[in-house]
Structure formats: C-alpha cells, structure tokens
Amino acid sequence: MNNPIKMLISGADMGSLIASCALHHDFHESSRQEDKFQIYRIEKDTLTMEDVDACDLSGVRYAVNATLHDNEASFAFDEKCKEQGITVIHAVNLGKTAFLAVEKPKGYPFSEVVKKGTDDFRCSLGKYISQYGMFWQMPVPWVDEAIMHYSKESFTQQGIGAYIAAGYCDNILVNLAEGKEVKYFPKFYLSPLLEEI
C-alpha cells in the first residue's frame, strides 16, 4: 500500500468543491499511483497573516490557493509554500469562466499579476489574460466582457466558474501526481463555459 498524497487547500467555497473532486477521483488508470489524496483545509476565502503563520506544511506535496486573492496574506501563503518546495495551484472563478495557474516553487511568481496600488485582483488578472492573448495573437474578448461585468457586480463564489475550476484543478493535481506534463505560470489554463470550435 502506497502513501497518500498530502495536499493543502485554502479557500472555503471553491476550496470545498476542489476537495470533493479530489476525494472522489478514481486512480484506477495507473498501477503505480498512490492510493488517494490526503487533504488538509484552511476553510477561509480571505486569509490573514495569522492563518499563514499557523499552517503546517510538513509533508505537503501540493497546495491549492482558491481564496479570493484579496490581500497580501493570500500571496504570503504562496510564498510560504514555495519556500518549502511545494507546487501551488491557483484556482479563480471568473463567473462563467475558470482560470488556473500552476506555480513552480522556483518559478515566475503569480503575485506579479497584481501590480501594487492598481485594480483589484480579478481586474488585474483579466488584463493579464487579455494581454497574454494579444501577445500570442489569440485574443480572448469574452474575458474583457467578464471583467467589465465583474466591475459592476461581484461573482458568486459558487458560480459556474467555481465548478469548472474544481474539475480542472482535480485534473491538474492528478497529472502532477502521475508525473504528467502541466503548464506552469506564466502559462495558464482558461476555460469558458462554452467556446466556439
């Protein structure tokens, strides 16, 4: 019997969806895969520095940051994980869209998305996605629309994007656990509810 993969999920609403997906994942496809995920939770959408200081990272292989990313403590959580060599997955609900980024311990910092003294996190993230798409000549105009909508009214934490993010996050966790390739930040995963093919 192999050891379970220990992971820490921060975030209450979307964090619970991600935990549920991970707990119900079937590893039957791989004979060498560990038995399951062992999940530890910080059930808060807004972290404090006290939460970050108190979280025990011993034995944790992966961390998921599904918080609102609305203060410095959220990014301090990432840094604490990275200092311990832990890969951090960021899951963000953008209404009817999900954004996910995988941050290597020594990779490009996800906190660079938010420039100090500028817009809130989701607006900064929308600008990052839009500029990334324009640079690679793959524009994503619906992201601009989603962010414009968000500036007028906030996203529900349990909206469609949260469910999409939970499913994607589970797939990323399984790929990491099985040693399969994933995209690392500054690359990212972006999934609208429906996309023309």
Residue ranges and their predicted role:
Residues 1-24, 29-31, 170:
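Glycine-rich adenosine-cofactor-binding loop
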Residues 1-8, 13, 175-197:
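Phosphate-binding loop/pocket of nucleotide- and phosphate-handling active sites
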Residues 4, 58-60:
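Short, well-ordered alpha-helix to beta-strand connector turns
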Residues 8, 61-164:
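E1/E1-like adenylate-forming module used to activate ubiquitin-like modifiers
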Residues 18-20, 154-177:
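Mid-domain beta-loop-alpha active-site segment that forms a flexible
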Residues 21-25, 79, 175:
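Short, well-ordered alpha-helices that flank and scaffold nucleotide-derived cofactor binding pockets
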Residues 28-47:
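NAD(P)-binding Rossmann-fold cofactor-contacting core
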Residues 50-58:
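Short amphipathic alpha-helix with an adjacent loop that forms part of the alpha/beta core around
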